[in-house]
Amino acid sequence: MNSLKLYLSTLRYLRLRQLLYLVKQRLLPAPRIKIDRAQAVQLRQGVLLSPSLVPDPSGCEDYEFSFLNVKRSFAAKRINWVCADMPKLWRYNLHYFDYLNDRSRSSDSLAEIVSDWIDTNAVGVEDAWEPYTVSLRIVNWIKWFLDDSFDTIPRQEWLRSLCLQAAWLEKNIEHHLLANHYLKNAKALFFAGAYFAGSDAERWFRKGLKILCEEACEQILADGGHNERSPMYHCIVVEDFLDILNLCLNNSGLVEPREIAMLRERTSAALDFLHDILAPDGQIPLFLSLI
């Protein structure tokens, strides 16, 4: 009875669209994704990105990963992508591929890690194929592909996998969760649509941009704070919008000036809010919520 009351109490705060998508997700079979693996993937020409915000080098070895203060090492081409003995959030981080920006690692080892992920993680595998995880991985792969400092030319197998991930994400947007997850989904579709060429890519781009513009107005409140009122989520969303502006401003004509102006204004407000809440040592307040 207590579980039922808790469940109903949670549902009462959801929007109708969230409830509908939640029911759809639970009752309907997963949508099938069709990609012609024999056809070469086409890229939009001349796409550029300025260097993104990157963490300090981790100091990890090429096949060593450290998340949540827990470090694991693997042999080359023998990464355990399941890691059942590790916490779920640790496993998620393994699949995010944030470490592609780690200057401690060699380009060759990163290339092997990407190929190993593709060979090991079929569509639908738990942890690897969840919308939030896929969203972060799409953006991280594209950033890496466009980063001249790694001197890595994307292989067709990588591009086909990236295209498949974007097609899968389009069918699995987190309408039932919204908030920062929804924004991550939109950002990934926007990046994939800007990176690839063709009708699918154009649809991803338009869909992602539409959601981003809507969510910039909804999630960044009048005072510049994020609507979840969490300093951590606020920082994550600020970085998302900085990445989005990076892509917009480095690729003339990609996005309409009025949309860029709106995104800049909302991002500027969010940066001002972040500046105002920082502690004297420059760290964010360690609260789950500011409310």
Q: How would you name each of these model-derived features?
A:
Residues 35, 39, 250-253, 282, ...:
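Structured alpha-helical bundle/scaffold domains in large eukaryotic membrane-trafficking regulators
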Residues 66-81, 90, 108-116:
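Short alpha-helical hairpin
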